[in-house]
Amino acid sequence: MKNMIFSANISKALCLATVGITLMMPAQVAAATPAMAVETQAVNEQGGITVFPNKEAQYRIPAIVECKSGKLIAFTDHRYHNQDIGGGRHLDIVMKTSMDKGATWSSPEQMVAKGGNGIATSFDCAHGDAAVVVDKKSGRILLMCASGGIGYWESKRGHLLMMGRYYSDDEGKTWYGEEVTKQIYDLMPEVESAFFTSGRICQSKQIKVGKYYRIYTVLCTRSGNRILYSDDFGQNWKVLGKNVAEAAPRGDEAKVEELPNGNVLLSSRAMGGRHINIYTYEDKKTATGSWGKVIASDAKNMGVAAHKNSCNGEVLMVDAKKNGKKVKLLLQSVPVGPGRNNVGIYYKALETPADYATPEAIAKNWEGCYQLSNTTSAYSTMVQGKNGSIYFLLEENAFKNPKTQTDDYYDIRFYDLSIEQITNHKYK
């Protein structure tokens, strides 16, 4: 099966050709037979908007939700010391809103979770890496995050990287939060450092035990991924699967998505692509089941290829049509590369149960990739709006002062995309 990358311009396509992707002009596509093809498409037509400009502050780590009213909320870290949580550094989680589907955004930034007390062992030293979901029925917003002033590599029992939980019941106008460090670490006695992967928390469309539909999120730990679920919208969490340590033993930041049969797809950050696994339910109500064998998805199996980079991205399943036939379409965003450059969205249809029966089936033979960015770009996330649009938020245009700053920070940019755009009109 051929993969096709729809690139923003010829110069970018030439760059992709250097990473082992065969370059072809559009007129040559039908007659040629390479593994991957590049076709031109102007990125500026997509109308990207800078929500958080890097000239105003040191921004990183995007998340986005659509509220019940249609209001959009974009979240990011405001990093005052140009680095992640640790060493007592100050980070806040901030937000902006849009009432017109992303055409315009509020200003200035609004505070969600404020840090800055300078005490590394205090919960309110810093907050970052927002993972967010809106409950489909009530409209309540849940945000899980990393907190405190102890870093991921410094963390150990008795001196832990902390965790926070925030709720809003008025579409982000007000927030109330609390520390949940003990509650989460008590689920995993073997883990000494963990944080919630930023971006989208997945809510089930099928499984409802009690008042809420089930939600899923993934912890990044130094011993691989730990997948959690909650049946009360984040008040209490449980580990998904007795063999959860086998889900992705080398996993990094990861996302989950619900498959058409209710099983859970794990897509974890990896050098060169993703690590893929599936949790197969025995009993959905009690959440019993088991994880399969993790499989790499990368250029070797015509999967999700992230050349010379390992980066957080989003996995999302949407309803689509091909020639009038309904299909489930799986999307995965990553920097196409080389390095943290050229963020794109890979796609593949799940047309039959065999297409998502095993991790291997999902990992291989992705159909194509829409390259959205033609510059430095890294973390990305997306949700599908009520109108069918794919609301996409990413880090773009890296910047740092090499004399005074150790890490890049970015513009946080928004794109309103359609399934037709992403798939070059193959699906709609």
Residue ranges and their predicted role:
Residues P26-T33:
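Sec-dependent signal peptide cleavage junction
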Residues K2-C15:
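Bacterial N-terminal signal peptides that target proteins for export
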Residues F6, G20-T22, H90:
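A general, composition-driven signal for non-globular sequence regions
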Residues A13-P26:
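Bacterial N-terminal signal peptides
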